[in-house]
């Protein structure tokens, strides 16, 4: 789930603005339940190897790993991660085992409500939640699966599969490494554009 704050998009921020955002958001969220029970981190105190380890555990994104000024919170069992200064000001990430997309959505949705009660999200009545990338605007939510595909990768079928899933508005990409042969043969299948939330789907029926 991607959320912007205020009128300045993440990519327009100066280093000074980025530092202020990290401090202000961290200070506002660290006392809020259940975030107060999460593990916190700040890139000011992490070296490159620590960041890489967090990225390999998928508690931070590859994009966040490359930022100079960032912080966040991670649930004790690492099923929920809150990233500050990712592609947008706030990125909420939730995991669930198996194919349980509903559970992952519920975790992310609850955390979105918690943070939304504390911070003022950028929102427009016509366009929904405003984000750095237009493709993320609206609900600001993207659903994805992590897939282990050793047979397809070993038989060089992935490169042919990528354009096929694209016809259905999906993206298939390597979690690590080259798309033709991802490290560990682990791939991510995700929506090209933001998803409608279950709430919106229910209202449209």
Regions found by a protein language model. Give the residues of each.
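Residues forming anionic-ligand binding surfaces in small-molecule and nucleic-acid pockets
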Residues: 3, 7, 81-95
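A structural-propensity feature for long, helix-poor, extended segments
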Residues: 161-195
């Amino acid at each position: 789930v991607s959320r912007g704050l205020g009128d300045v998009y993440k990519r327009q921020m100066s280093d000074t603005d980025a530092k202020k955002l990290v401090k202000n958001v961290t200070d506002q969220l660290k006392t809020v339940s259940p975030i107060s029970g999460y593990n916190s981190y700040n890139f000011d105190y992490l070296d490159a190897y620590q960041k890489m380890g967090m990225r390999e555990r998928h508690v931070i994104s590859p994009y966040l790993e490359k930022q100079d000024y960032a912080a966040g919170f991670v649930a004790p069992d690492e099923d929920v991660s809150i990233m500050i200064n990712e592609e947008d000001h706030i990125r909420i990430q939730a995991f669930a085992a198996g194919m349980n997309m509903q559970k992952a959505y519920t975790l992310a949705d609850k955390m979105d409500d918690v943070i939304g009660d504390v911070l003022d999200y950028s929102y427009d009545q016509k366009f929904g939640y405003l984000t750095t990338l237009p493709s993320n605007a609206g609900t600001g939510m993207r659903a994805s699966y992590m897939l282990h595909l050793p047979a397809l990768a070993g038989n060089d079928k992935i490169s042919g599969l990528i354009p096929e899933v694209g016809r259905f508005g999906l993206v298939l990409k390597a979690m690590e490494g080259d798309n033709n042969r991802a490290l560990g043969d682990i791939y991510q299948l995700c929506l090209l554009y933001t998803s409608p939330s279950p709430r919106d789907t229910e209202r449209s029926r």
